[in-house]
Design a protein with these regions (language model features):
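A short acidic, leucine-rich amphipathic alpha-helix
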Residues: 27-33
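Short, Lys/Arg-rich nucleic-acid/phosphate-binding segment
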Residues: 61-67
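Short capping segments at the starts of secondary-structure elements
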Residues: 18-27
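Short, hydrophobic-biased segments on the C-terminal half of alpha helices
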Residues: 45-49
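Short alpha-helical segments that sit at the start of domains
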Residues: 1-14
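Glycine-centered, phosphate/nucleic-acid-interacting loop/turn motifs that mediate DNA/RNA or nucleotide
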Residues: 55
Length: 69
């Protein structure tokens, strides 16, 4: 069964597709704000986690513990 994506998840997916590069959740938050699609940082993290669990995004964890999506 396909899960329904939230508006926040859709916005994040669109930004990730347009960037064509890996980005941290913090940088994604800043990018969303610059595109006037502001949402809370906690919302960004929750949406990324849900997208990861659905297999829509891949995560890579760097040696310093930072995750890139």
């Amino acid at each position: 069964m396909k899960t329904q994506r939230t508006r926040s998840q859709e916005r994040i997916l669109n930004v990730l597709k347009s960037l064509n590069r890996s980005i941290s959740a913090q940088d994604l938050y800043i990018e969303l704000r610059s595109r006037e699609m502001s949402m809370g940082l906690a919302t960004v993290y929750r949406a990324l986690e849900a997208l990861k669990l659905d297999g829509m995004v891949q995560v890579r964890t760097l040696a310093n513990g930072e995750s890139l999506y």
